Amino acid sequence: MITTLTTLFATLFDREQLLQQARSLHAIERLKKIHPADSVLALVRSAVGDERPSIATARRQFQALTGYRPEESSFYERLTPGLANLCWKTFLGALSKATHVQRREVARALGLKVRDIRAVDASVVSLPERAAKHLPSTDSRLGGFKITAALSLLEDLLVSAHITDARQHDRKAFGLPKDVEGVLWIHDRGYADHRLFAHIADGKGYFLIRLKSSSQPIVRSIRSGLAQCHLGKHLSRELPVHGVVDLDAEFTVGRNQTRVFRVVGIPVARNKQGRADWIWLATNLPESTPATTVGTFYRLRWMIETLFRALKGIGRFDEVPSGNPAVICAFIGSTLIGLVLSQAICVAMRVERPGSEPSLMRVFALVLSNLSDLAAAFHSHRLEAALEPFVAALWREGVNPNPGRPYARDRHLATVAA
């Protein structure tokens, strides 16, 4: 595990590589005493530290890392669009170096050859009113941005993150990548676009997307949960369904085309209004995948809510106090660097000890508290020795403190793999 972490931290701590990237991105004009690697580390610690993230906090973190306290104006001048791009590029570099772990037994539960299962969702973060000019919000008194993230459920890693202003609709903020083949995409109602269904299916991918109440396709065949006399009717929520519903329905795609996709209805004891209800899921998973398994896979979508809680709780995504778009983007990239490092460490822990339950929240906090010491050890070629107490702390403090109550992710994955 120490070898894995050495490679992982080298991505962030390689000063020469970061300096070359900074020059290519015009993040610096002259080196002087403020090295871009130290600036990025200071921003990461400021973004996910104990204090409110701000330029003043980042300046103090810079002093803690280097022993040098730059003038406020000098430090602020370094927070340029180039430095914001450097933070984002470093985040993408950490993303590409993350260790991958395939859960083949989960793929077998689907009865399909899938490369990955990805949950997509978005979360809105409020910003001060002075940011509204560049990042407008739905509230005219505030600015805001929306982060649209794709999370690999098999690898428990962030796959992509896209930033837009807060007014952007969920569907428009999500761009379907080219590598859809063999990937199961899980989305909430904000992405219930029939054209998206068709694009994923045409790309030889799979989808599992919750339907809006306004989506009422025509019932074409019924396997369970609805009487055959309702063939040819619109799938209205008033139809007399019972138990788990499994059927095929015809969707309108665009103006003139139609496509037939599978629809699964999963009963829930109580909805938000306290009444019995059904969750309706559109999918192109074949009939050989049981309807109950389809419902269990959709429950895994809540893993991405845990990711957003980590970003807003430990990363304090919603506490960026600036109206400067370069500063905002720098703090966003810095927070995501800390998150990806923490996720990759969790994956390495699962590889080292199969069956262990690392906690993203706890590991995130440990990364924060040890980041400066690990960076200093890397620069003095003592990283491997410094990693030994860090790894010991991970196993002591970074795992589920109550193994008798497994986390939802492990519980649901165990269910579908059984």
Identify the role of each PLM range.
Residues T66:
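Blade-loop segments of beta-propeller domains
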Residues M1-I55, Q61, R69-P70, F75-E77, ...:
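Single, function-defining residue in the core of a domain
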